[in-house]
Swiss-Prot record:
Its EC number is 2.4.2.10. The lineage of its organism: Bacteria, Pseudomonadati, Pseudomonadota, Gammaproteobacteria, Pseudomonadales. The keyword Glycosyltransferase applies. Homodimer. Disulfide bonds: none annotated. It is an enzyme of class 2 (transferase). This is Orotate phosphoribosyltransferase. Orotate binds at F34, F35, T128, R156. One of its GO terms (biological process) is pyrimidine ribonucleoside biosynthetic process. 5-phospho-alpha-D-ribose 1-diphosphate binds at residues 26, 72-73, 99-100, 103, 105, 124-132. NCBIfam families: pyrE (TIGR00336). It catalyses: orotidine 5'-phosphate + diphosphate = orotate + 5-phospho-alpha-D-ribose 1-diphosphate. Catalyzes the transfer of a ribosyl phosphate group from 5-phosphoribose 1-diphosphate to orotate, leading to the formation of orotidine monophosphate (OMP). It holds the Pfam family Pribosyltran.
Length: 213
């Protein structure tokens, strides 16, 4: 595990974004942990989050021309990542996002910010079912751009209804890498090393054994 990944897990726990207990997911599964990126909800938290995304961008080695944040959750994530790349990695890159509803007046259209052109890195919080990413892929295709990859905060490494996870399905269907700041592997490693949180390790390991990929 990289230092920034360990720092990100600690940061997510401290912010209440990553919690352990018993949670019912949309899928109906009872999960021993829950990740809610909406709780990165202050200026300093968003700035710090952008630095973690930027570190993961650099680590991934994915070549791209523009960052894209899908509405709505992806918008602040893409902007924070763009700021962090410029301030901390000397990479001043364009970014843009989409509106859920196209606008007929003003600048018009459904895209805001830089033109969506060339190789596009999509920034989002998680991929649950993959539906949102499929919509984004169509937006990129409509602009004659190319998806270079997807970066999310957490890969749950959890299969859907079939044998693959939603992330693996996206990788298979679109032939692009999906990378994350951390995956469940790193969360398990963090729990094993933390005396106060180690109590949650058996439940998370059991969940992984049942639903993991």
């Amino acid at each position: 595990m990289q230092a920034y990944q360990r720092d990100f897990i600690r940061f997510a726990i401290d912010r209440g974004v990553l919690r352990f207990g018993e949670f019912t997911l949309k899928s109906g599964r009872t999960s021993p942990y829950f990740f809610n990126a909406g709780l990165f909800n202050t200026g300093s938290a968003l700035a710090q989050l952008g630095r973690f995304y930027a570190a993961a961008v650099v680590e991934s080695g994915i070549a791209f021309d523009v960052l894209f944040g899908p509405a709505y959750k992806g918008i602040p994530l893409a902007s924070a990542t763009a700021v962090a790349l410029a301030e901390h990695h000397d990479r001043d890159l364009p970014w843009c996002f989409n509106r859920k509803e196209a606008k007929a007046h003003g600048e018009g259209g459904s895209l805001v910010g830089s033109p969506l052109a060339g190789n596009v890195l999509i920034i989002d919080d998680v991929i649950t079912a993959g539906t949102a990413i499929r919509e984004v892929m169509q937006i990129i295709k409509d602009q004659d751009a190319t998806a270079a990859g997807v970066l999310i905060a957490l890969n749950r490494q959890e299969r859907g209804n079939g044998e693959l996870s939603a992330i693996q399905e996206v990788e298979r269907d679109f032939g692009i890498p999906v990378v994350s700041i951390v995956s469940l592997n790193q969360v398990l490693e963090f729990l094993a090393d933390d005396p106060q949180l180690k109590q949650h390790l058996p439940a998370v390991e059991a969940y992984r054994a049942q639903f993991g990929i």
